């Protein structure tokens, strides 16, 4: 009776490499062999524009992501996207609004231009984010820290994990990122019990767009292995 299986492309707070497009293709084919009717969905957050192809081009039925991450190019102020099979998009649109209207109507709050401009600029923005992640990984590796992925590894998201080893080190790192930010550099982040998280979380994001992860930011749950 399984209707859908999903996979998260990005590392998230885990200690693993992001799932590559080739691995997603293998997963899609594996699921299809078991049951061709199962919907195969990919959480594509942080992974857009890392490769020439996106998951829907290697067999995923539907993907979803956030516009304040990669595809918004740092300009989109809010929003998300879903794309994939037309019949699934229609069903999703009916759930988001109401049957019969679907995606034909809906508020954009005047954000269409910045969303489209952000999408246009996104590949270059993601390119810069990846270079920054590689540089960060190399610097901290030379300082003796364990990093994931390694600077020379293939990447499938923009996340760089650094194992800092203690709660104090995690908080100090995030406070350093915030202090060097262009916005709210006077703020000193502290862990707190954020809704939706199992552990206290500390977040540094001195970004022009609230909550943006395509700008330089750092966040972590206060739990082992403290990365």
Predicted feature residues:
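Conserved PLP-enzyme active-site core in the AAT-like
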Residues: 1-127, 131, 137-140, 144-148
